[in-house]
Amino acid sequence: MKFKKIFYLFVVLIFLTACKNEKSHVIRFSTGEVYKFETLSVEVIADEEKMTTREIFSSKDNGEKLDEIINLLIKCKVVDQGYSYDSIPDHNSLLINLHNKDEEDTIYMYDSIRDRDTNKFHYSFYGKLGDQESPTLLSDDDLISEIKYIVDK
């Protein structure tokens, strides 16, 4: 009798574990790297002196806008850290936080100025992406303006 109860309890536990609803999202960058995350938030610099941020978007209950942001990010080319350059965040900057269970990675979008050498917009990814640690994302589009437009509509 005890064996049956333990067996049924075990079956119910397996069933509940299988039914657990964890929705993850995937960004497949144009260069083939794949990044999985659970939620995404967008922040702006609220106070430049104190370097505080304010959240302007969260992917929770905002699936349509999240899909639009992902569709912009998948166009980015992932390159090594050598393409990044120092920049100071200001009120025009965006921070995209990608949340997983145990960690958070961030894409820093400092300015909307094309690089003279590559003629592309450079954004810094802080975290591990593929086999690279803290790579640079290159884009033909001004993602800061486009993401702000998506968030504001």
Predicted segments, located by residue:
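Bacterial N-terminal signal peptides that target proteins for export
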Residues: 1-7
